[in-house]
């Protein structure tokens, strides 16, 4: 059986007039829509039932045939087929045009395809098409040239001069169609290739462009004259509906107006032609018809757009596809789904990690079909209809059935904006009273949810497969690690941290200090009877069974630590248990803060897996909430102690500032030096006041506890509360040299308050802008990398990518261990001293092996990387390495491209927006934060360009009065000099030895320069380290592999420079793998291979250059992408995720991959024993 969705690829092309007539069910001859009295469609009009099908199911227009029994009969009176009304969504009509018109996409697009293939300028073409000039079609014996333009006067003169039939000239689309008809594609292709060999410069570029269009037509089987339309297809009426409003008026789709204009003008033209009207009138009518068709296809592309009531431009066919509200993004990629609901969320601290609270009435509506089925199964209802009635009337027995249905049916919870894959997780529902969804506090971080009125959506997975995937892959208890860096995301926050911190503190001189207890239970009893304080240092006798023998001994601890350790596995490796005296020690014998909690969770996950970790987390959560309540840690103004030393510090600084001002007035220092010195002084003083404050706070001071534990607040906030606010920036970002000396505790005066409003306002404005920019960056990243899926186990590449520890100055930011763990080496790693092989190539390195390599003193290692992966589509599991979200090897089918895009985009909102101004120094404004990331991924020429050395050699400096020059002397003695503009800071010194591609002045480098000087590896390295720099500055950790995936997509295309004997055209972009394949083929035949060089594309360009036209069209520039694809007759292989979502197939990732869908199960019936059959429950 032919299934509509059962195809592997999709091709787009130009439609011939014959094809359009073949699609159509009849010609639309009248501009009428529906009869205003009967409200029935007019015959032969835009809604005609004879052409498009009946308005009502199984009912013809005249009413002769009603009911399903006449299915398929065509009424003899009105000619309407008796069928379902939904055929009005698929049946098309057509309009036969009295004169051909050109298709605006192919004439007006950039570059004009029609112009290129005819070798005419778009302006000349426009004159012909819109009846301003004649074009010579056949000069015959006259000295006129073919395709020469003649205006009315010249045409008349030529006819007078050469006689009536001496040459053929015409105007309008008919003339263009004749010219297009005459084109011999094979011949043109040969001629252009010959011309290409000899031409240069602009002429060469034009020939390449023309050749591209000619080759597209030649290879795709499209005919050039199909760019001129003889027949216009009319889309089905239910896709351009007309609906009656309350007041009896009609609302209609704009398309109907546009079609009406075309039909009106076409009919008028037919009439004029029949009457034999004068040429000038006919010509005007033809021009109007051309304009009407242009407006229908793409309104506003040429001239002023056609407007409807209220001067609103009408939405044409192109507008229906374009933009966020167009067909692609609104309906194909963003569908609304049934079995879903949304409500406000409230906190549910009593829930287990895998549970969520679902309001009863919501659950009943969501699980309605399941409840109805169960009611019938349990014999509570006789049939589905009565079951439905029971549910609708909410009879008491329905609730019991609902409990039963819900018991192991997970639901998905989603919070918008879904910035990464943890924005949708699965939970086991628990029915709750009220109308709010209850959410577990530990998943709030992943959702970025709080309970100030946030709403969340619930979705029900229906099929058994969907339920299984939700339970095994999406359950909240399984999603403990962040896919971007592999650190835990379900870390307790706020109260839970505060409670744990409070529990693990110790205090001197409190009740019960020094007491000795016989067992932990006795300690708890004493604490509950208030005989011992929770922070008292006590001794307790512990028993533990180790390797089958019981050990006992006395340890020193506090009741709080004993309570906290009840929920922690005692083998996490914090304590070396091989030392005898450590065997009984408590695992967590230190003060627990948010940071250390993260470490505890990571260790527990690595050692015991997700389930045990989620149980531990629930216990920590319960204890944290309980003891933060008991601790009663609150904020009061008396907790903000202004430090004694503050006054003295301020007075000293003021004296020093006065000294600096004096020096400036005497002319010893410049204005700039004065400003910098004053700023430095105040910065240091603010820091000193803060340190004095932190030193004076008691460790049991509630504000200090909150900040120190990481529950809420930070050192800088405490500094502002009780120290001094410090320096502020003015609206342009320059620091004002008058600091705010007061703290919030003391209160600000009017001027201080005014100064602080600048920053506050700028912060709010920035946040709003940042969210939109960050969202757009994520969208581009997703589009460029969405088809990167792990498609094979090993691509077999020998190449690797060299990594070493990352240093900034003398500080190691990322040690080698972090860069190696979870990867495969691409060559054997050999011990530098002993010479033994530590790790064989292609062996998975976990953290222990990576540590071993690092401890051996090895500084650089070549690893398998996404950069060097040879998989044609997607990547292979070896080059990718570890899946950050599970700390296991990655599985085939994982959509690593999307995960990479989300990992880079999600922290985007945390990055700053600002450009730092360095006090008016020319050319030194460096972009940072989000704009810098965008600049790198778009491969733009950055602001504040650095001068880069093109050669390697030694630096020589020359300074004259007018300018500074740096000369680089190469080893061969060749000198390359660079003029340094005033105000730039030089990075090199006299006599320095530098490599090609190194910066001479400070600033950002243009990535295209690095590509030119250092090659593709250099640019990949540069982009990776620069993007990482921005994120690291904000304290955001992103694993390198995510950036590698995106950067690989940016460097996948090659620009052909010389085609050799291949079919490739010079100047065109082609995929690296296709390029290598084409060359391999030619070399086997003994021909000359093509030459090209890697092109660095920005993410927008790279996303549009994908093989899939569906994906590109749904991203940006829809009309341009589709025009290009149609002419080339492109085939979309449907390999990525977007294109499959668009056509409604399962995405080829995870269990939707073809290799998983095509598994066959063979059961050998004979070998199953009789008695074992019963035990298998399905």
Curated annotation (Swiss-Prot):
Q: Where along the chain is Mg(2+) bound?
A: 450, 452, 454
Q: Which family does it belong to?
A: Belongs to the RNA polymerase beta' chain family.
Q: Where does Zn(2+) 1 bind?
A: 60, 62, 75, 78
Cofactor(s) required for function per UniProt: Mg(2+); Zn(2+)
**GO BP term, pick one:** DNA-templated transcription
Q: How does it assemble?
A: The RNAP catalytic core consists of 2 alpha, 1 beta, 1 beta' and 1 omega subunit. When a sigma factor is associated with the core the holoenzyme is formed, which can initiate transcription.
Q: What is this protein called?
A: DNA-directed RNA polymerase subunit beta'
CC cofactor note = Binds 1 Mg(2+) ion per subunit. Binds 2 Zn(2+) ions per subunit.
Q: What is this protein's function? A: DNA-dependent RNA polymerase catalyzes the transcription of DNA into RNA using the four ribonucleoside triphosphates as substrates.
* HAMAP family, per database record: RNApol_bact_RpoC
Kindly list the GO CC terms recorded for this protein.
DNA-directed RNA polymerase complex
């Amino acid at each position: 059986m032919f299934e509509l969705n059962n195809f592997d690829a999709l091709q787009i092309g130009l439609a011939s007039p014959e094809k359009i007539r073949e699609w159509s069910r009849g010609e639309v001859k009248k501009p009428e829509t529906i009869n205003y009295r009967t409200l029935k469609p007019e015959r032969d009009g835009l809604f005609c039932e004879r052409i498009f099908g009946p308005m009502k199911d199984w009912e013809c227009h005249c009413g002769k045939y009603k009911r399903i029994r006449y299915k398929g009969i065509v009424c003899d009176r009105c000619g309407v087929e008796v069928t379902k009304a939904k055929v009005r969504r698929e049946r098309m009509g057509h309009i036969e045009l009295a004169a051909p018109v050109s298709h605006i996409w192919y004439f007006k697009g950039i570059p004009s395809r029609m112009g290129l293939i005819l070798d005419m300028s778009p302006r000349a073409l426009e004159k012909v098409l819109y009846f301003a000039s004649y074009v010579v079609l056949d000069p015959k014996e006259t000295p006129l040239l073919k395709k020469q333009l003649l205006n009315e006067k010249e045409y008349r003169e030529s006819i007078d001069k050469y006689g009536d039939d001496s040459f053929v000239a015409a105007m309008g689309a008919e003339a263009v169609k004749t010219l297009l008809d005459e084109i011999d594609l094979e011949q043109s292709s040969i001629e252009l290739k010959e011309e290409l060999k000899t031409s240069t410069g602009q002429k060469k570029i034009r020939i390449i462009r023309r050749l591209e269009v000619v080759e597209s037509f030649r290879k795709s089987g499209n005919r050039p004259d199909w760019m001129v339309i003889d027949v216009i297809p009319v889309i089905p009426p239910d896709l351009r509906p007309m609906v009656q409003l309350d007041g009896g008026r009609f609302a209609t789709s704009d398309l109907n107006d546009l079609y009406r204009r075309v039909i009106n003008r076409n009919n008028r033209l037919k009439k004029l032609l029949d009457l034999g009207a004068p040429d000038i009138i006919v010509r005007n009518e033809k021009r109007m018809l051309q304009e009407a068709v242009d407006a229908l296809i793409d309104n506003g592309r040429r001239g002023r757009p056609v407007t409807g009531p209220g001067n609103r431009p009408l939405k044409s066919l192109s507008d229906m596809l374009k933009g966020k509200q167009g067909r692609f993004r609104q309906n194909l990629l963003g569908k609304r789904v049934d079995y879903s609901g949304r409500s406000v969320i409230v906190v549910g601290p009593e829930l287990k990690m895998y549970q969520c609270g679902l309001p009863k009435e919501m659950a009943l509506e969501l699980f309605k079909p399941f409840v109805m089925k169960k009611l019938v199964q349990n014999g509570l209802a006789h049939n589905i209809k009565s079951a439905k009635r029971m549910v609708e009337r909410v009879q008491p027995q329905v609730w019991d059935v609902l409990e039963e249905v819900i018991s192991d049916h997970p639901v998905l919870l989603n919070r918008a904006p879904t910035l990464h894959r943890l924005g949708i997780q699965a939970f086991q529902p628990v029915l709750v009273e009220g109308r709010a969804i209850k959410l577990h506090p530990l998943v709030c971080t992943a959702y970025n949810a709080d309970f100030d009125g946030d709403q969340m959506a619930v979705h029900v997975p229906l099929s058994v497969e969907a339920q299984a995937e939700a339970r095994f892959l999406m359950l909240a208890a399984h999603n403990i690690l962040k896919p971007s860096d592999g650190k835990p995301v379900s870390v307790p926050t706020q109260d839970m941290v505060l409670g744990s911190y409070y529990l693990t503190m110790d205090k001197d001189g409190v009740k019960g200090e020094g007491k000795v207890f016989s067992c932990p239970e006795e300690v708890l009893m004493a604490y509950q009877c208030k005989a011992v304080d929770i922070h008292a240092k006590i001794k307790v006798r512990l028993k533990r069974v180790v390797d089958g023998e019981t050990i006992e001994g006395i340890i020193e601890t506090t009741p709080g630590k004993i309570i906290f350790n009840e929920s922690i596995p005692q083998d996490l490796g914090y304590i070396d248990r091989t030392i005898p005296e450590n065997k009984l020690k408590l695992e967590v014998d230190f003060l627990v803060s948010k940071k250390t909690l993260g470490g505890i969770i990571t260790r527990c996950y690595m050692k015991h897996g997700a389930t045990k970790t989620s149980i531990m987390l629930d216990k920590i959560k319960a204890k944290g909430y309980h003891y933060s309540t008991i601790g009663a840690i609150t904020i009061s103004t008396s907790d903000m102690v202004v430090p004694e030393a503050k006054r003295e510090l301020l007075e000293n600084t003021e004296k020093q500032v006065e000294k600096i001002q004096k020096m400036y007035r005497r002319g010893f220092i410049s204005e700039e030096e004065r400003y910098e010195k004053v700023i430095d002084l105040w910065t240091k003083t603010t820091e000193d006041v803060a340190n004095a404050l932190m030193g004076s706070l008691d460790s049991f001071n509630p504000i200090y506890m909150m900040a120190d534990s990481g529950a809420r607040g930070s050192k800088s906030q405490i500094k502002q509360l009780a120290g001094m606010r410090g320096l502020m920036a003015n609206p342009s970002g320059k620091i004002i040299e008058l600091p705010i000396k007061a703290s919030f505790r003391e209160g600000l005066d009017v001027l201080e308050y005014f100064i602080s409003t600048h920053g506050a306002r700028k912060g709010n404005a920035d946040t709003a802008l940042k969210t939109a920019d960050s969202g757009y960056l994520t969208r581009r990243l997703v589009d460029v990398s969405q088809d990167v899926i792990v498609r094979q186990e090993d691509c077999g590449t020998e190449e690797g990518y060299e990594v070493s520890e990352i240093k900034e100055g003398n500080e190691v930011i990322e040690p080698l261990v972090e860069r190696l763990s979870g990867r495969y080496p691409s060559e054997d790693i050999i011990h530098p001293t002993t010479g033994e092989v530590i790790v064989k190539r292609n062996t998975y390195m976990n953290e222990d092996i990576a540590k071993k390599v690092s401890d051996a003193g090895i500084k650089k290692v070549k690893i398998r990387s996404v950069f060097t992966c040879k998989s044609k589509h997607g990547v292979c599991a070896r080059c990718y390495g570890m899946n950050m979200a599970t700390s296991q090897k990655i599985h085939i089918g994982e959509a690593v491209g999307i995960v990479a895009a989300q990992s880079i985009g999600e922290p985007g909102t945390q990055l700053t927006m600002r450009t730092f101004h360095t006090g008016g120094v020319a050319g030194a404004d460096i972009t940072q934060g989000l704009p810098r990331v965008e600049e790198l991924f778009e491969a733009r020429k950055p602001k504040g360009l650095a001068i880069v050395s093109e050669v390697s050699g030694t630096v020589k400096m020359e300074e004259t009065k007018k300018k500074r020059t740096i000369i680089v002397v190469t080893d061969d003695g060749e000198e390359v000099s660079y003029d340094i503009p005033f105000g730039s800071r030089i990075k090199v010194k006299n006599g320095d030895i530098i490599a090609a591609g190194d910066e001479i002045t400070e600033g950002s480098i243009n990535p295209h320069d690095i590509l030119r000087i250092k090659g593709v590896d250099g640019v990949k390295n540069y982009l990776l380290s620069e993007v990482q720099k921005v994120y690291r500055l904000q304290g955001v950790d992103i694993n390198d592999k995510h950036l590698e995936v995106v950067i690989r997509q940016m460097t996948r295309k090659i620009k052909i420079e010389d085609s050799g004997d291949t079919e490739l055209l010079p100047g065109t972009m082609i995929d690296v793998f296709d390029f290598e394949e084409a060359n391999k083929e030619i070399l086997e035949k003994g021909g000359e291979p093509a030459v090209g060089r890697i092109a660095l594309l920005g993410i927008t360009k790279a996303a549009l250059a994908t093989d899939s036209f569906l994906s590109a069209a749904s991203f940006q520039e829809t009309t341009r992408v589709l025009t290009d694809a149609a002419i080339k007759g492109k085939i979309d292989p449907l390999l990525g995720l977007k294109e499959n979502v668009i056509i409604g197939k399962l995405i080829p990732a995870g269990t939707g991959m073809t290799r998983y869908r095509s598994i066959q199960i063979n059961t050998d019936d004979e070998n199953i024993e009789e008695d074992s059959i019963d035990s298998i429950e399905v």
